[in-house]
Structure formats: structure tokens, C-alpha cells
């Protein structure tokens, strides 16, 4: 199937855009936060990128209807980069299950106190919200990284609507 995006007058639908982005494999993260009542929230996210090294800042794009975004607006969030064995966590946090945190082992991170999926993430960043802006049905959130935990493991990837594992051999 060929989708033409450069035709004059062509209208790109949400389905067209989703199909385009499925062709861009990326790592898989679970964004976590705690709301004002102390309840943890989280969602699977592939819209994540580094912004600057000084100060260390990243951005995530979250659906405006997300309960996780509401908790992130409290000022802090965690980025859990999932390893190859973290697929189940990716699936749990991409569903409408109410008690997602009851399905995985997690703990509060040392510095920011954000939910860290220690058994499913090979890296964790605890962030403080510095700025956010609404674009369409999503909100772009800039987070200054205040905490990093890393382990050596192979990352979980997602592309072409499938999970995969990075292999050093290629």
C-alpha cells in the first residue's frame, strides 16, 4: 500500500499518520507519576526523546485524556525504559486496566519518589516538569532529569505494530 503525502490538496487522516509512525521503530517506555491522592498512574509511551544535555531534559507526548497526564501535571514523572523481558509491562500499561500497578512489581525511586518498574525497566529517569504545551489531542511535557538508574540489558522495541528485541548482532 502506498500513501501519498506530497500531493497538492491531499488530506492526511489520523489513520494515515498512525500508519506512517508505525514504520518508525523505537524503544518502549512506561511513563509513571503519582497523583495528589498518592495513587500511582502509568501508561506505555513511544513518544519520547532527548531535548538537551545541559540541563539534562527529555520530552514525552501524552494523550490529553490520560489519567497519567493528570498525575504528571503535579510536577514530577518517571520514565521507565523497558528491557526485552518487559513486554508484559508494556502491554499492561497500554490497556484500560484500572490497577495496572497491581500487575507489576514496582517501587518508589530514591530521588523523585516516582514509580520505578525495577523488574521490567533497564533504565529509569526521574523528572521534574519544566514546561508543557498542548498540540492537538496530546500534550508535550518537558522534564528535567533529576535521577538516572541504569542496568545493562537489551531494550524492548516497538515498530510495525510488533514488539521486538534489539540484538547486538543486528
Swiss-Prot record:
Catalyzes the NADH-dependent reduction of FAD to provide FADH2 for the halogenase RebH. It comes from the Bacteria. This is Flavin reductase (NADPH). Signal peptide: none annotated. Keywords: NADP, Oxidoreductase. It catalyses: reduced riboflavin + NADP(+) = riboflavin + NADPH + 2 H(+). InterPro entries: Flavin_Rdtase-like_dom (IPR002563), NADH-dep_flavin_reductase (IPR050268), Split_barrel_FMN-bd (IPR012349). Its EC number is 1.5.1.30.
Amino acid at each position: 500500500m502506498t500513501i501519498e503525502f506530497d500531493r497538492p490538496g491531499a488530506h492526511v487522516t489520523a489513520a494515515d499518520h498512525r500508519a506512517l509512525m508505525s514504520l518508525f521503530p523505537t524503544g518502549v517506555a512506561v511513563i509513571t507519576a503519582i497523583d495528589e491522592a498518592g495513587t500511582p498512574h502509568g501508561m506505555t509511551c513511544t513518544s519520547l526523546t532527548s531535548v538537551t544535555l545541559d540541563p539534562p531534559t527529555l520530552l514525552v507526548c501524552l494523550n490529553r485524556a490520560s489519567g497519567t497526564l493528570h498525575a504528571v501535571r503535579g510536577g514530577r514523572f518517571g520514565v521507565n525504559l523497558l528491557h526485552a523481558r518487559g513486554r508484559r509491562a508494556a502491554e499492561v500499561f497500554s490497556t484500560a486496566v484500572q490497577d495496572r500497578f497491581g500487575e507489576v512489581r514496582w517501587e518508589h525511586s530514591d530521588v523523585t519518589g516516582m514509580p520505578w518498574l525495577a523488574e521490567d525497566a533497564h533504565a529509569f529517569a526521574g523528572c521534574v516538569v519544566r514546561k508543557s504545551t498542548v498540540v492537538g489531542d496530546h500534550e508535550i511535557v518537558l522534564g528535567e532529569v533529576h535521577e538516572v538508574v541504569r542496568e545493562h540489558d537489551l531494550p524492548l522495541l516497538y515498530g510495525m505494530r510488533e514488539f521486538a528485541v534489539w540484538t547486538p548482532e543486528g
